[in-house]
Amino acid sequence: NGRYFAYVASFGAFTRSSYSATQAAKNALGHFAYILEGLGDLDSLRPYRCAVEADGQRYEGEFIFGAVCNSTSLGGLVKLDPARVRMDDGKFELLLLRMPKTALDLQNLITAMTRMQYDYPGVILRHVQRVTVTTEENLPWSLDGEYCPSAPRVEIENLPAAVRLMRG
């Protein structure tokens, strides 16, 4: 949608903490500032009804979190297995977490993510080049930790080798 990111585009649970933690808190507390901010989001955990199309596959339903990333760590709160993430493969990692039905399901989802068990039924992890997210809800995004307003349709495409780095 005309915006670029290098690290992560995300929506849902704990996404707000990436752009609402104050710079002073981040300077003083580092990673812990995000955790404190994220804890405040626990009471407002809610599903977002979306349709996600990724390289010809379609995922529909209620998700509490979604991310399109090129990293093993998302705000320090979510970790991806470094053996499954390649920075130079021309693909993003698409991570979707389905809305748990019960508190036990939520606990199991958190355990699965902590243990990097991506075969858990509430977890979708794919390597993709192109993603389209469609929703009728207000779905704010975070792009590399900066607030990005909701849009009914968000298109994300990996642009391999789009940036050229020079050494002096």
Label for each model-derived stretch:
Residues 10, 55, 64, 68-73, ...:
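Histidine- and/or cysteine-centered catalytic micro-motif in compact active-site loops
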Residues 25-32, 73-104:
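Gly/Ser/Thr-rich active-site loops/lids in small-molecule metabolic enzymes
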Residues 1-65:
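Catalytic core of DAGKc-family lipid kinases
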Residues 54-55, 60, 86-89, 96-168:
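ATP/nucleoside-binding phosphotransfer catalytic cores, i.e., glycine-rich phosphate-binding loops
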Residues 10-14, 67-83, 147:
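Glycine-rich phosphate/pyrophosphate-binding beta-alpha loops
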Residues 8, 20, 69, 95-97, ...:
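Short beta-strand-to-turn element immediately C-terminal to the catalytic PLP-Schiff-base lysine
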Residues 35-39, 48-55, 76-82, 116-119, ...:
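Glycine-rich, charged/polar anion/phosphate-binding loops
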